Amino acid sequence: MSLLKMEYNLYAELKKMTCGQPLSLFNEDGDFVEVEPGSSFKFLIPKGFYASPSVKTSLVFETLTTTDNKITSINPTNAPKLYPLQRKVVSEVVSNMRKMIESKRPLYITLHLACGFGKTITTCYLMATHGRKTVICVPNKMLIHQWKTQVEAVGLEHKISIDGVSSLLKELKTQSPDVLIVVSRHLTNDAFCKYINKHYDLFILDESHTYNLMNNTAVTRFLAYYPPMMCYFLTATPRPANRIYCNSIINIAKLSDLKKTIYAVDSFFEPYSTDNIRHMIKRLDGPSNKYHIYTEKLLSVDEPRNQLILDTLVEEFKSGTINRILVITKLREHMVFFYKRLLDLFGPEVVFIGDAQNRRTPDMVKSIKELNRFIFVSTLFYSGTGLDIPSLDSLFICSAVINNMQIEQLLGRVCRETELLDRTVYVFPSTSIKEIKYMIGNFMQRIISLSVDKLGFKQKSYRKHQESDPTSVCTTSSREERVLNRIFNSQNR
């Protein structure tokens, strides 16, 4: 820990990393406060900030020679086999760490690698290479299984803890496994933080973008007050401000053979309204809709739009164009709606629900990986980050209000490299509720733009359903509306 006065150059360097976001740190009294320029307080500067050689400092950081927390179950023959790009990452990490050791810098590195790169297996290789006792911290238990599989493949002694940290501490008094796989809420326990700071050298923060370290969270406090000897942040979409806690980044681009297509399933609807819809419309401009809660609630009860989504999915699935589908909503009730409707059509052998309230969901996710055809309905919160079903070939985005980081993570669910190359995403920019028509169009255009400009998708117009079924809800009400629709689409390509 280093308590320092906030001199101008230090403040400028830290503030630059926040990209306009308020800079917040722990002060000498232990309060987590916004840092003002010229402040007379001393602040706790995160250890990982000094990982970059561009940060000038006279501070000297302890090295691995001061600890003896070595893995005992290591077997070099169990090291995973890596692809060339993954080996390149390992080479970059080892080279950077040698330089850090020579210059007595903290061994903190962010691995900024694309969705589907294989961050888990690459990090397990690094873990085995370092030979140091390791804590793997995940944001939710959905991610436990993929880590368990890779750690077991390396042959490392490990312990998984997702519930009570108190019972874990009791077990650690008699045994200290080489690898601990825990959920981040364990870091709310100071005794546990002290224990891993003393007995474990390597800390791996998986999906680091899910933590806003400019907030006073358990992870923020852990990194500030109990900084590990070595640390990896793993993410495909790094938060700029989090770099303050891990100020060295390795990013290696991945070329892909995947054929990625995004369809905008557009349609004009007759205006649709109910008493419930009219009630929610009144709240659109109020403070209760600050995070677009009512915008998403309106989408969840937009029956013509919901029917369009169902019609499109059913037609594509029955035709065999797509086979392993992820359906994503923002709200739980919207998820349940689609699940029930699809369950009636295809049955429980095909349709599954990713419900955060069901403790059996992780086991169910594990089981459907072996299926050739399935429909998995879930929420953005539960499955938008870290869902490990590599065989997914299609994604239906039923919600609209999604930030750029969430969009990239969500699209990454269908960008895992497999022998099958076709990947398809469906978005639905139309709504029958006129009060949110342009808002939904703008949000959907952001999803399309990011997928095309950053992730290599090709945008195509989806006309099959509208043309094949003139009686469906997506039929336009007049020839003039069809013309306007084409004009609108051409302007937004």
Swiss-Prot record:
The keyword Transcription applies. One of its GO terms (biological process) is DNA-templated transcription termination. Its EC number is 3.6.4.-. Keywords: ATP-binding, DNA-binding, Helicase, Hydrolase, Late protein, Nucleotide-binding, Phosphoprotein, Transcription, Transcription regulation, Transcription termination, Virion. Residues 309-456 form the Helicase C-terminal domain. Interacts with OPG087. Might be part of a transcription complex composed at least of OPG087, OPG110, and OPG145. Belongs to the helicase family. Poxviruses subfamily. This is Transcript termination protein OPG145. It comes from Vaccinia virus (strain Copenhagen) (VACV).
